[in-house]
Amino acid sequence: WSIGEFNPDNLQTSCGMDFGFSIDPDSLTEVAIDKKHKKIYLKEHIYQNGLKSQELAKIVLDKVGQSLIIADSAEPRLIADLKHAGVNIKPVKKGTIESGITRMQDYHLIVSPESTNIAKELNNYIFSDKASKLYVDNYNHAIDGIRYNVIYHLDNPNAGKYFVQ
């Protein structure tokens, strides 16, 4: 991965979101996937603890408007609350952590300079047991949201495209 300008080619973007609350932060990352050049551009918008549903919805709408957000399916009530508040959000079928990370590793990640928490996570995300490919459940909040977005778009190649017949 490297630090660089976010989405210099004006690719279609969407967001990945992981939910937290007291100990873990809510994270929202804007993602642009360049399949041709095998690059994923990342821009951090939210990395904050303790947000209530209404506060989170307001910040999300202020930061990314109606951009599609792919989020952790483990929080259906929060997803429903955010949808009710006007957020364009969909749950993802997560699959394994390993499969999502493997998909991400097929691409060069480019992190915008202001995305310090993403950079910190990428520098510290490690295996707890390399043989079994288990990851330490730490430094993974933005990474999880990014992983949800990448899984959604790479497993649904027509996501976000419209066809006229």
Where do the model's predicted regions map?
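ATPase catalytic-site recognition across NTP-hydrolyzing enzymes
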Residues: 1-17
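Short, well-ordered loop/turn elements at secondary-structure boundaries
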Residues: 9-11, 22-25, 63-65, 105
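Oxyanion-binding "anion nests"
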Residues: 15-30, 42
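Mg2+-dependent endonuclease catalytic cores in nucleic-acid-processing enzymes, primarily RNase H-like
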Residues: 29-135, 162-165
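Structural motif
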Residues: 135-141
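Stable alpha-helical structural segments in soluble proteins, enriched in small hydrophobic residues
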Residues: 141-153
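Acidic two-metal-ion nuclease catalytic site recognized across multiple nuclease folds
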Residues: 153-165
